[in-house]
């Protein structure tokens, strides 16, 4: 067949398609800015509203969520540093609202996706740890330095998943504390997914709020993401505003506040230490201490009351003995005034 001199070649067609795509790629902001102007003739800045993905959270609510997770990041920095016995730094990189589909597309595959039940709220959330951080944590807990990650593209083994499960459960306790001002959140670990496509907790078009945390463990840097669907926190979304916080400031001390304070104090862990005795040693003796060395205490301590400390305060006298096959102490008397532990009673009297 003879070539038609007026026909377009394949290269011409490809060039036309490319030019059309490039013109369509211009943002709507740029297009509107070229046609909309003020009465004075100056161009006005126009904000685009996408009806396919309407904002569910106001800027004020996003800022409130950000402040909660700044506290969460501080708590997590402390808990992970203690767990890994290595300097860990966690901070909030961004808080955005987007569709669930966009979130799923933005994370690597494989990764570590923990499905979280957000009791007492209905629905689930996702806590994602990217492979770089997950393998650094696992390597450190297995005795490594956590800085050398050979293969980040593989799935976690069953043992490694079990280790990450315990770490995530530890982190979730920090989340409960961070959200305690608006809800008594009791996040419960559900299960781990490694393929984001299998973690369908809401429809793809559902709006979520995404908290991205930058994490540094020694020399390793990576991300953690907390995905919270709007339908999950919809019952408390009205509390994520300054109006709600101002109303709390005006309430003052009430029986409800005292109940919350009482619950906090009653669930606060306090160390109790029974001092068996003390030994004075010279510095050179301390430096030479080794496994198997014996420190001689007073023989009279066996029948002598010991001091029981609550925190750093001496509060009770006790006597050492056995309960079953365990060494135990029995409280024999209170030491002085324990009024410092009766704060709740004083507060209750003030309200009355």
From Swiss-Prot:
GO terms classed as biological process: bacterial-type flagellum-dependent swarming motility; positive chemotaxis
Pfam families under this entry? FliM, FliMN_C
**Where is it found, in Gene Ontology cellular component terms?**
bacterial-type flagellum basal body; plasma membrane
What compartments host this protein? Cell inner membrane; Bacterial flagellum basal body
Describe its membrane topology.
Answer: Peripheral membrane protein
Q: Which UniProt keywords apply?
A: Bacterial flagellum, Cell inner membrane, Cell membrane, Chemotaxis, Flagellar rotation, Membrane
Classify the main location: membrane
> Molecular function terms in GO for this entry?
cytoskeletal motor activity
Q: Which CDD domains match?
A: FliM
What does this gene product do?
A: FliM is one of three proteins (FliG, FliN, FliM) that forms the rotor-mounted switch complex (C ring), located at the base of the basal body. This complex interacts with the CheY and CheZ chemotaxis proteins, in addition to contacting components of the motor that determine the direction of flagellar rotation.
Q: State the similarity comment.
A: Belongs to the FliM family.
Q: What's this protein's name? A: Flagellar motor switch protein FliM
The source organism is Borreliella burgdorferi (strain ATCC 35210 / DSM 4680 / CIP 102532 / B31)
């Amino acid at each position: 067949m003879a070539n038609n001199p007026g026909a377009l070649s394949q290269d011409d067609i490809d060039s036309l398609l490319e030019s059309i795509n490039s013109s369509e790629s211009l943002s709507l902001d740029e297009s509107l800015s070229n046609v909309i102007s003020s009465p004075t003739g100056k161009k006005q800045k126009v904000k685009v509203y996408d009806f396919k993905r309407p904002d569910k959270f106001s800027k004020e609510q996003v800022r409130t969520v950000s402040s909660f997770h700044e506290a969460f990041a501080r708590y997590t920095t402390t808990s992970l540093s203690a767990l890994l016995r290595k300097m860990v730094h966690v901070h909030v990189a961004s808080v955005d609202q987007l569709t669930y589909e966009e979130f799923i597309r933005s994370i690597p595959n494989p990764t570590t996706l923990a499905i979280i039940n957000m009791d007492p709220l209905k629905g689930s959330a996702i806590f994602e740890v990217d492979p770089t951080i997950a393998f650094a944590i696992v390597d450190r807990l297995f005795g490594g330095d956590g800085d050398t990650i050979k293969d980040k593209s593989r799935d976690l083994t069953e043992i490694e998943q079990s280790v990450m499960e315990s770490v995530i459960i530890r982190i979730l306790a920090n989340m409960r504390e961070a959200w305690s001002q608006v809800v008594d959140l009791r996040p419960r670990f559900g299960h781990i997914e490694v393929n984001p496509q299998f973690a369908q907790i809401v429809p793809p078009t559902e709006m979520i709020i995404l908290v991205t945390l930058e994490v540094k463990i020694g020399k390793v840097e990576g991300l953690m993401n907390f995905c919270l669907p709007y339908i999950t926190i919809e019952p408390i979304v009205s509390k994520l505003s300054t109006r709600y916080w101002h109303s709390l400031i005006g309430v003052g001390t009430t029986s409800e506040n005292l109940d919350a304070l009482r619950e906090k104090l009653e669930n606060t862990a306090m160390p109790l230490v029974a001092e068996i005795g003390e030994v004075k040693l010279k510095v050179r003796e301390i430096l030479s201490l080794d496994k198997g060395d014996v420190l001689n205490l007073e023989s009279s301590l066996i029948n002598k009351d010991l001091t029981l400390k609550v925190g750093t305060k001496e509060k009770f006298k006790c006597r050492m003995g056995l309960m079953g096959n365990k060494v135990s102490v029995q409280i024999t008397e209170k030491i002085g005034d324990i009024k410092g532990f009766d704060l709740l009673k004083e507060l209750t009297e003030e309200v009355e």
